[in-house]
């Protein structure tokens, strides 16, 4: 894996936009009803969910195509749908996200839809509407014709198989052979246990459970599984196989070698859609000429990003770029962000239904009182943002002898504290503008302030947020430390 980070960043930003990926497979619509649980039903021992809002987005193969588009490339999706409102909703969503949807509509078959009911980050129930069986032969003929029509303009082909009746063996083999004639790489995300239908593909990307079922090997015996994967590479004529191993990472398996790309540490909220992000990223890597090892590394980063989100959600190009950049800098430094970067982070945290806490101050000569404040502030929510006054702002407030420690050094020290998720520097006299931009759920201030005296308190309370005053640790302050030093 010799390519440096700068080259990879350049490839993602400037090469992927010229790539075109064809996805064929089981398209779905994922629907979500979000709500709050306040009590148990008197009719049965089940929670009552009070619905607050509803969302929907592409799932299955359609989510693979969406990931490709969000990563900056062109995507075309071919698959079966019904002739219903969900088919139109799916087409509209994809079209608005620059995905060309070429669906074969089948009478008597619904558009596959999965409705999930969630409270907070907890999934309460899932309802599936589908007919997972073969369509008429004429439908398969149309599907193959449309896929072959798009193939010459494609840089890679993905077969996204959710075992819902689209990718029959004859469909897979027709498309794999056509792609091979044009030297177009074929990537398969399998759900069927019979991998022989994917013979001749460039790579198959099963998860650990899928690999165990296909190989008929005990899930707990990783060495035997990876040996079986090597046999599959040989027997199926693959270039390589990639197996997602959950917390262990992703294994890249060739005929005579296995390399494991370690998992990226992330807080896991929802694993749905991770495999879609992995194969979308891997397809773009191969289509742009990167070697498989680099492709697996990028796919690993993409999967880690997606599992940190709630629900089926694609990986964004900027998220992959940020993750790749963060690898080349210390973790603490990566937590020091600009205002625009902070707003992107806050937006992502909100999509995950995370509670955001903001505190602010000069934080000059960090001491135990500061640490106590930060640890208590973190306890009020899921993410803690620390906003610090710039050097110019500190001088305006404290005089020309301050700060003792420069803004960049103060920011780096704060970022090294585990309780802190992001540090941002503001140049204004007060953090009001930043508070209004981030709209925190909780605003925390240390000291003996009245809530009414806290900058931003009125604004935070106006949108339903809370203001918390944390008592100071007696005997510790920056001023006293300076006096003691003198």
From Swiss-Prot:
CDD domains documented for this protein: RfaE_like
One GO location term (cellular component): cytosol
Chain positions covered by the region annotation Ribokinase: 1-331
Positions of ATP binding: 207-210
Any Gene Ontology biological process: ADP-L-glycero-beta-D-manno-heptose biosynthetic process
Keywords: ATP-binding, Carbohydrate metabolism, Kinase, Multifunctional enzyme, Nucleotide-binding, Nucleotidyltransferase, Transferase
GO molecular function: ATP binding; heptose 7-phosphate kinase activity; heptose-1-phosphate adenylyltransferase activity; phosphotransferase activity, alcohol group as acceptor
Pathway(s) annotated for this protein in UniProt: Nucleotide-sugar biosynthesis; ADP-L-glycero-beta-D-manno-heptose biosynthesis; ADP-L-glycero-beta-D-manno-heptose from D-glycero-beta-D-manno-heptose 7-phosphate: step 1/4; Nucleotide-sugar biosynthesis; ADP-L-glycero-beta-D-manno-heptose biosynthesis; ADP-L-glycero-beta-D-manno-heptose from D-glycero-beta-D-manno-heptose 7-phosphate: step 3/4
EC number: 2.7.1.167, 2.7.7.70
Pfam hit, one: PfkB
Family matches, as SUPFAM superfamilies: Nucleotidylyl transferase, Ribokinase-like
Catalytic activity: D-glycero-beta-D-manno-heptose 7-phosphate + ATP = D-glycero-beta-D-manno-heptose 1,7-bisphosphate + ADP + H(+); D-glycero-beta-D-manno-heptose 1-phosphate + ATP + H(+) = ADP-D-glycero-beta-D-manno-heptose + diphosphate
Catalytic site positions: 276
Keyword Transmembrane helix: no
Sequence segments annotated as region (Cytidylyltransferase): 358-486
Record's function text: Catalyzes the ADP transfer from ATP to D-glycero-beta-D-manno-heptose 1-phosphate, yielding ADP-D-glycero-beta-D-manno-heptose.
Description of how the protein assembles with itself and partners: Homodimer.
UniProt similarity note: In the N-terminal section; belongs to the carbohydrate kinase PfkB family.
Name of this chain's protein: Bifunctional protein HldE
Organism the protein comes from: Koribacter versatilis (strain Ellin345)
Name of encoding gene: hldE
């Amino acid at each position: 894996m010799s390519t440096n980070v700068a080259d990879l960043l350049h490839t993602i930003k400037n090469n992927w936009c010229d790539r075109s990926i064809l996805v064929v497979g089981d398209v779905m619509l994922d629907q979500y009803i979000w709500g709050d649980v306040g009590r148990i039903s008197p009719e049965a021992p089940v929670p009552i969910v009070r619905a607050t809002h509803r969302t929907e987005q592409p799932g299955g193969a359609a989510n693979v195509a969406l990931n490709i588009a969000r990563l900056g490339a062109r995507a075309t999706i071919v698959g079966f749908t019904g002739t219903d409102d969900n088919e139109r909703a799916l087409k509209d969503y994809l079209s608005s996200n620059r995905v060309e949807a070429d669906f074969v509509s089948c009478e008597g078959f619904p558009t596959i839809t999965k409705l999930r009911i969630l409270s907070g980050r907890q999934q309460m129930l899932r309802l599936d509407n589908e007919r997972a069986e073969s369509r008429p032969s004429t439908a398969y003929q149309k599907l193959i014709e449309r896929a072959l029509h798009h193939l010459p303009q494609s840089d890679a082909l993905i077969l996204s198989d959710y075992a819902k009746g689209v990718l029959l063996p004859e469909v897979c083999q027709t498309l794999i052979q056509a792609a091979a004639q044009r030297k177009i790489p074929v990537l398969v995300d399998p759900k069927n246990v019979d991998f022989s239908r994917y013979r001749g593909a460039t790579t198959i990307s099963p998860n650990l459970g899928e690999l165990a079922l296909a190989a008929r090997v005990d899930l707990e015996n990783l060495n035997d599984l990876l040996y079986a994967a090597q046999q599959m590479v040989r027997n199926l004529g693959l270039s390589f196989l990639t197996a997602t191993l959950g917390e262990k990472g992703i294994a890249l398996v060739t005929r005579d070698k296995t390399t494991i790309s370690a998992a990226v540490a992330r807080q896991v909220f929802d694993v749905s859609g991770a495999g879609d992000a992995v194969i979308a990223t891997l397809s773009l890597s191969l289509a742009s000429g990167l070697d498989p090892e680099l492709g697996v590394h990028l796919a690993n980063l993409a999967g880690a990003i997606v599992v940190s989100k709630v629900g089926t959600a694609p990986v964004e190009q900027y998220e992959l770029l940020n993750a790749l950049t963060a690898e080349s800098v210390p973790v603490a430094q990566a937590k020091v962000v600009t205002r625009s970067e902070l707003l992107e982070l806050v937006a992502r945290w909100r999509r995950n239904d995370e509670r955001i806490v903001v505190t602010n101050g000069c934080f000059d000569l960090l001491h135990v009182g500061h640490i106590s404040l930060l640890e208590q502030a973190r306890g009020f929510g899921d993410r803690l943002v620390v906003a610090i006054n710039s050097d110019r702002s500190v001088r305006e407030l404290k005089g020309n002898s301050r700060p003792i420690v420069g803004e960049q050094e103060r920011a780096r020290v704060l970022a090294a504290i585990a309780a802190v998720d992001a540090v941002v520097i503001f140049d204004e006299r007060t953090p009001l503008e930043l508070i209004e931009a981030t709209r925190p759920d909780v605003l925390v201030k240390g000291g003996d302030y009245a809530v009414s005296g806290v900058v931003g308190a009125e604004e935070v309370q106006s949108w339903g947020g809370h203001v918390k005053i944390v008592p100071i640790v007696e005997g510790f302050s920056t001023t006293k430390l300076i006096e003691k030093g003198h």
